[in-house]
Amino acid sequence: MAGCQSIARFAVQLVVLWMVVMPGESARAANDFIRIDDYLQRHPEQPALMADFNARVQAPALPLTAPPRREIRIAVIYPALQASDYWRRSLASMEARLRALRLPYQLKIYLSRPTVDVDLQARQLNTALQWRPDYLIFTLDTVPHLRMIERVLALGRPRLILQNITTPLADWEDDQPFLYVGFDHVQGTRLIADWMLERAGYRGKYMTLHFSSGYVSRMRDGTFNAMAARHPELEEVESYDTDGDPEKAYRATLQTLQEHPDLKMIFAGSTDLALAALRALRETDRMDVLLNGWGGGAAELEALQDGGLDVTAMRINDDNGVAMAEAMRLVMLDQQARVPAIFAGDIALVTRDTPPERIDELRRRAFRLSEPPDDG
């Protein structure tokens, strides 16, 4: 019964996030998602744990001095079949850190498309659990994901790492996943919105391209729209749910440009949508329209440096892969109590005005394990 109630509340919360007025209230609207600051107030022991853990993530690896008795088993279910390289880099950096820690492991990887492959993800979860892994790395974006996760929590094993979400669910406070890990969608979107709205002069027409109706899109798109709503001379003229389909984003952009030739901005909720919108802008010679990316992966950085994108929130990507490996190391050392509930990595604003040397510096830091330097 409790599981059904939390599923219903999660569904209501997604609707509320879509209708949110103020971004600071989005995670509290139905008292389901707990923003990081609020969580730290409820759990005063967490700031010290998070600071200590972050120091471990930033520091060089400290290899185990004695080999473990057996390999750890890690099952990964990722919606990685998309243009963004976030998931691929997360996996590569986690594996690189595990090797540096001399922590032997077996890995089973299950990939899918975001939004549309929920049934496949459910089958992948069943297969993964039959393998009896020590760790399951998954995500939470839709109501079906919630059902899958509550099944794992009810089983009591494996240890569950929820990636790409840094706002714990209130319903799970007494039975939390092992770790929430990723980058704060609200924080990153605020960086983008502050820059875009100022460049637009806080006036004009804009459109929104939604990746899906899930949690991530609601956090990103809802935050941008809430910040834009503070300025009465800004008008959202179109809002498209694309189901994660770049072709839908491309066609929606073309249609909006035709119907609103004075369009000033496009807020894109993901890398795939940003690149699709960019294709439409180039084809119509409308590169004057402001366009953002989200995440700052390799494809976005290339588009930004080529003059296509105007701004992005760049994740220091590999930190979240390192964080997962370091959490496993602490468990191996029987120090699980030193693992915080949340790891939220750093995000940097990158714009068309950012000097190339600064972008190179951020790239080396963000991709330090997933994109090793060329020794040639």
Language model segments and positions:
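Hydrophobic alpha-helical segments within soluble ligand-binding/sensing domains
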Residues: 179-204, 249-250, 297-300, 316-333
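Extracytoplasmic "Venus flytrap"
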Residues: 54-63, 73-93, 101, 110-119, ...
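Hydrophobic alpha-helical
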Residues: 135-155, 224, 242-302
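Flexible loop/hinge segments that line or gate small-molecule binding clefts
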Residues: 143-144, 148-187, 298-305, 310
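Structural motif
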Residues: 106-130, 239-259, 274-275
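An alpha-beta-alpha
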Residues: 74-76, 94, 190-239, 328, ...
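Short beta-strand elements in bilobed, periplasmic/extracellular small-molecule ligand-binding domains
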Residues: 99-117, 205-210, 225-247
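Hinge/cleft segment of the Venus flytrap/periplasmic-binding protein
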Residues: 29-70, 319-376
